[in-house]
Amino acid sequence: MSQTEEKKGIGRRVQAFGSFLSSMIMPNIGAFIAWGFIAAIFIDNGWFPNKDLATLAGPMITYLIPLLIAFSGGRLIYDLRGGIIAATATMGVIVALPDTPMLLGAMIMGPLVGWLMKKTDQLIQPRTPQGFEMLFNNFSAGILGFIMTIAGFKILAPLMKFIMHILSVAVEALVHAHLLPLVSILVEPAKIVFLNNAINHGVFTPLGADQAAKAGQSILYTIESNPGPGLGILLAYMIFGKGTAKATSYGAGIIHFFGGIHEIYFPYVLMRPLLFIAVILGGMTGVATYQATGFGFKSPASPGSFIVYCLNAPRGEFLHMLLGVFLATLVSFVVAALIMKFTKEPKQDLEAATAQMETTKGKKSSVASKLVSSDKNVNTEENASGNVSETSSLDDDPEALLDNYNTEDVDAHNYNNINHVIFACDAGMGSSAMGASMLRNKFKKAGINDITVTNTAINQLPKDAQLVITQKKLTDRAIKQTPNAIHISVDNFLNSPRYEELLNNLKKDDQA
């Protein structure tokens, strides 16, 4: 294997790990927001203080949210059975450290117990006497839950206490030394070229929850989510950009600032690598502003939208929130404008930059791909139904795997029994939701009413999936998750000619 291929393989594995972390947190963001509203509104210094209702905030962050995260992690590994026992075992960590929200502990315990439950069943089920299945299933789960709850209480809890102490001390040291803005030097480039949701939800969300539970709010929720640096880049393109980049920057700015989908500005930075300086300085400015004003959120600002920022702003600190976003935007814009004004035009166009971003992130971006319109054709050979046995031998060659499943030849498949189409993306929320909504509208206009269209994360694709639509860089992972399904790859969730081809095939099968 060449060094380049090895690096790509490592990148895919790290991206998949980051995706797994965010898949535990993102489905539970609604619970975080509900807790944040209760804390912001009903606590003593909230918008409408209520002593009785304020008592909800503590148990929610101490028990409810860690249990939800543990359940999500266990379910990702071993469906409901893994999720239930994972949540059970996590109680050991929670009870051992009742004063610290055990989000990190839940993120460890959930997948671990889910995996152990899976291995336990694989060991016991083939040896279970006929007629004793329910007894063995229930007792094996109960015994594992018992053992892991004790292990969580006695082993993982002390370890988590030590880890949380080290991390808290590190964050506090940065805050007291007024060095927290320096974190942006790592965060801003990392989220553009590699990990996005994993940084916010895998690192800042659990640490921020611990800080918010103790101090009432956390600045950590603002570090990655501030829409200002990205808006500054896009404003610079609106004024000083040329061609396609300038024309598309207006729509991108609206999607980014109000929709909170940050990945849409990543290609604009990659077109001119010097713009990394602009987003870093913009991010540092935002963090420095919030640190100087003592600003923070009570719950995660997800997605990183200005609307979410407005809704999450604590009482009496709305102007502080506006100031942080405005200054981050201003600094990013000024630096980007200077770079664009006094440096040469990039050799790389927007389409190439989008492709580069998707390669480094190990995933395709529908909102970024919306900026360009291109379809790439690859040679295809056989239907997915005949390829399940060959998948394992192609795991290390994503292109061959896609060829083997005819992912870009819509006409190569039989759609007679299809009644469910699933759009799958990394997190299962933003881009796949937009793609599913768009295809539902196309089906409605075409009079196709007997096919359901939904969206999900790749990690949560059901084993009995019939037809899965993914962006090309993610299709190999989707195939490994659901090898029996028909898989279609697109370059752009919102603008692909393959949808019309799919509609034509479905109409033919319906008329046959």
Swiss-Prot record:
InterPro entries referenced in this protein's UniProt entry, alphabetically: PTS_EIIB-like_sf (IPR036095), PTS_EIIB_2 (IPR013011), PTS_EIIB_2/3 (IPR003501), PTS_EIIB_mannitol (IPR029503), PTS_EIIC (IPR003352), PTS_EIIC_2 (IPR013014), PTS_IIC_mtl (IPR004718), Sugar_PTS (IPR050893)
Protein's GO biological process: phosphoenolpyruvate-dependent sugar phosphotransferase system
Which stretches does UniProt call biased (Polar residues)? 380-392
Domain PTS EIIC type-2, chain residue ranges per copy? 17-349
User: Do you know which PROSITE patterns this protein is assigned to?
Assistant: PTS_EIIB_TYPE_2 (PS51099), PTS_EIIC_TYPE_2 (PS51104)
Could you tell me which residue ranges are on the Cytoplasmic side of the membrane? 1-28, 76-139, 192-278, 341-512
- Residue ranges spanning the membrane: these are 29-50, 55-75, 140-161, 171-191, 279-298, 319-340
Molecular function terms from GO: kinase activity; protein-N(PI)-phosphohistidine-mannitol phosphotransferase system transmembrane transporter activity; protein-phosphocysteine-sugar phosphotransferase activity
Q: What is this protein called?
A: PTS system mannitol-specific EIICB component
Q: Species name for this entry?
A: Staphylococcus aureus (strain MRSA252)
